[in-house]
């Protein structure tokens, strides 16, 4: 995969290990039934495997006390340069986002309008929601966001939201494996639509963008 974003999806990762093009496979069969070289395969990320050592050391009952009762354990987070204390931290799942921003990150060093949490295709969370949001999978799912790998990327007020959305479409177009045409074509079309709006060639249509996003999500295999 040579660092391809799509290899964050388990079947694409398996394809890459086998020497095939890094593309998503249809499921079922799932990797636990038929995975690497057609053998049953368990795919976990490094963070999950690292938690296994803590569970063996502390015991499962003690480990269950870490977190908020819904999401258990800890989560690595990374804070970008718009925080006064940027860096990599480990926090309990269920920690309030406001605590992460103010106490761990030391607040922002610029006027921020939103945070993108969870990677290049993670959720974009407006600042007015951050005060009530907690760092756990359930809270993010209920809010319509993805927690992902919990990177915190700040979007300053001075940066155009449309320009930022264009950047995300461009990233998707570059990283698409190309197997599903809604993603392969939709990402390019989304980038073109936003470019035209920025350049004043056509009016920005929120409805068209949402229709395109829904088509890409429903019509693709991985919906990354």
Report the location of each language-model feature:
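Hydrophobic alpha-helical positions that pack around
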Residues: 1-93, 105-107
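Short, surface-exposed loop/turn segments at secondary-structure boundaries that line and modulate
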Residues: 2-6, 12, 117, 121-126, ...
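Conserved structural-core and active-site-/substrate-pathway-adjacent residues in large, well-folded domains
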Residues: 8, 100-101, 180, 222
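Intrinsic disorder at enzyme termini
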Residues: 28-32, 36-51, 56, 111, ...
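Flexible, glycine/charged-enriched surface loops at secondary-structure junctions
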Residues: 62-70, 74, 109-118, 179-182, ...
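Short, structural beta-strand-to-alpha-helix junction motif
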Residues: 92-100
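Terminal amphipathic helices with adjacent charged low-complexity linkers/tails
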Residues: 108-143
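Ferredoxin-type iron-sulfur electron-transfer modules in oxidoreductases and energy-metabolism complexes
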Residues: 133-224
């Amino acid at each position: 995969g040579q660092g391809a974003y799509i290899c964050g999806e388990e079947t694409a990762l398996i394809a890459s290990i086998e020497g095939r093009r890094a593309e998503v496979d249809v499921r079922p069969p799932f990797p636990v039934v038929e995975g690497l070289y057609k053998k049953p395969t368990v795919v976990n990320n490094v963070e999950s495997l690292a938690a296994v050592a803590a569970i063996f050391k502390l015991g499962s009952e003690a480990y269950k006390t870490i977190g908020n009762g819904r999401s258990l354990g800890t989560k690595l987070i990374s804070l970008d340069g718009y925080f006064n204390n940027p860096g990599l931290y480990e926090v309990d799942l269920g920690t309030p986002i406001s605590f992460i921003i103010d106490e761990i990150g030391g607040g922002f060093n610029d006027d921020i309008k939103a945070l993108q949490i969870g990677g290049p295709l993670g959720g974009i969370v407006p600042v007015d929601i951050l005060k009530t949001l907690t760092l756990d999978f359930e809270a993010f799912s209920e809010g319509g966001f993805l927690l992902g790998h919990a990177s915190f990327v700040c979007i300053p007020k001075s940066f155009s939201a449309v320009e930022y959305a264009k950047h995300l479409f461009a990233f998707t177009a570059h990283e698409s494996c190309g197997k599903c045409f809604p993603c392969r074509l939709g990402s390019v079309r989304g980038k073109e639509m936003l470019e035209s709006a920025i350049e004043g060639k056509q009016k920005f249509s929120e409805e068209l963008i949402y229709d395109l996003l829904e088509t890409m999500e429903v019509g693709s295999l991985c919906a990354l």
